[in-house]
């Protein structure tokens, strides 16, 4: 995919960065080289982590078009809002419910979701604002979306790495 979309030849990247790695380099230098290599993917969802540091490709977020302003949100919400399990919610003018979900990284508890939706059930409309959401756990996003349909629906496929080989992945499920 990366080769088709971006012209990235991962084998060439591997060869180029392998030349920079030596047996006597420090842990910090090795981490820096590997971080640079992983950043070639230009993917904000790929990180290199250790007990001492985390490297991430921030440009995807920093260069993302800004379509969200905390100050505008504070004008609409004022101080009359509730935070519950990663959700910020309130009832706006004209009896419109508003839920802001800034991340799917943390789980949303069923009880918290029940409380949020029960409070907003009296509303004439509902806005679910996921602008500036950095992503996270697909299960969390599915849990929120499932509250708005009675039908089971396919939302995507997942594959898992199953071995050290280049193409060692599970079947899409």
Name these PLM-found stretches.
Residues 1-173:
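Flexible, low-complexity junctional segments that flank or bridge functional domains
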């Amino acid at each position: 995919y990366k080769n088709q979309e971006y012209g990235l030849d991962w084998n060439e990247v591997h060869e180029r960065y392998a030349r920079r790695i030596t047996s006597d380099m420090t842990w910090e230098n090795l981490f820096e080289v590997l971080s640079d290599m992983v950043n070639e993917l230009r993917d904000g969802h790929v990180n290199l982590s250790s007990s001492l540091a985390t490297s991430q490709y921030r440009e995807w977020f920093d260069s993302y078009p800004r379509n969200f302003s905390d100050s505008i949100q504070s004008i609409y919400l004022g101080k009359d809002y509730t935070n519950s399990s990663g959700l910020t919610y309130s009832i706006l003018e004209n009896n419109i419910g508003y839920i802001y979900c800034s991340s799917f990284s943390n789980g949303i508890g069923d009880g918290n979701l029940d409380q949020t939706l029960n409070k907003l059930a009296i509303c004439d409309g509902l806005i679910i604002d996921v602008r500036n959401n950095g992503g996270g756990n697909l299960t969390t996003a599915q849990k929120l979306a499932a509250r708005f349909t009675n039908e089971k629906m396919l939302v995507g496929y997942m594959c898992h790495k199953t071995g050290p080989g280049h193409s060692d992945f599970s079947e899409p499920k």
